[in-house]
Amino acid sequence: MTRKITRALAAIKAKKQDVLFLGNLDAHRDWGYAPDYVAAMWKMLQCDHPDDFVIGTGEAHSVREFLDEAFGYLNMDWHEFVKIDPKYYRPNEVDFLQADPSKARRVLDWEPRIFFKDLMRIMVDADLELIGLESPGEGAKIIEKHHGSWHRWDSQVVSMGAHANHSGKEYS
């Protein structure tokens, strides 16, 4: 869902798309940054005995909040571009999903480094650059601050581009 939003936002900013169609804006999710989760997986593999862990940020945010943050980051009003389409409602959707990573914090000494607002900025910046636009630049600064030089911004943009829709069609 988040990537659908940030790709569409970039396409809207580039005048390649007019509308983003979404379903339930009130669904809450615990969105996190994949490299943080890979770090947690590495720590799991260092354990002497196998165990189960829940990995997440421990924060839940709605799709509506994501729209507010993503479009607001570019000083845009999402209400002008987002349309609700009932076909995107999921009949069996769980409305609220939030991880409890307390065991991972305690046993693995693991903490996520990237949280909601920063994740959104990383994604928006990367998708703007993928479509050929200049980004505000906060994403690269956030990655450098929290992950240092091992995680390069250009790698972030390239890895996101591997999954991008370059067809020019609207993201619905």
Name what the model sees in each region.
Residues M1-S172:
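C-terminal substrate-binding subdomain of Rossmann-fold SDR/epimerase-dehydratase oxidoreductases
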